């Protein structure tokens, strides 16, 4: 399996992560995210994303099947970033509420809607539901950068 991954061409790798949900909107961010850990975008439009997040036994913290909140948060974060849908979007902060426990085997659906869009700043509201039960609600603040965050000079050199 590992050998197969290494032998993929860059084009094949890109195609695997490339997603067009309708004729006009394509996913431009988080294209290499692990869908098994963070879910998959199933709907995408300007300022909106829907992510389906099927939970697995590897995410459980105990024998009862309780899913660790970090996995739930990761899927919500992915939905928020997909709603912004800019290549260099980064999360700045979040205020989240875990409203009901998530159990192994449940598929949580996250809907993310951009609520505020001014210049580089974006506020995104995310709701996660299992069936009709709201399990997560959060507000995310993101910033869209000119280039990848690792290519920015964030601090002055000590020599200056």
Write out the residue ranges for each language-model feature.
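Non-catalytic linker/capping segments at the edges of enzyme domains
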Residues: 1-58, 154-160
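Hydrophobic beta-strand-centered segment that forms part of the acyl-chain substrate-binding groove
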Residues: 78-114
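Non-catalytic surface loops within mature trypsin-like serine protease
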Residues: 55-57, 100, 144-146
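A short, polar/proline- and glycine-enriched secondary-structure boundary/capping micro-motif
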Residues: 61-65, 92, 147-148
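A generic structural signal for short beta-strands and their flanking turns/coil linkers
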Residues: 35-37, 47-49, 90-94, 106-108, ...
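A conserved, well-ordered hydrophobic junction motif at loop->secondary-structure transitions
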Residues: 50, 58-74
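A structural signal for short, well-ordered beta-strand segments
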Residues: 51, 94-98, 112, 126, ...
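HotDog/MaoC-like acyl-thioester-processing domains
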Residues: 2-20, 88, 103-104, 115-160
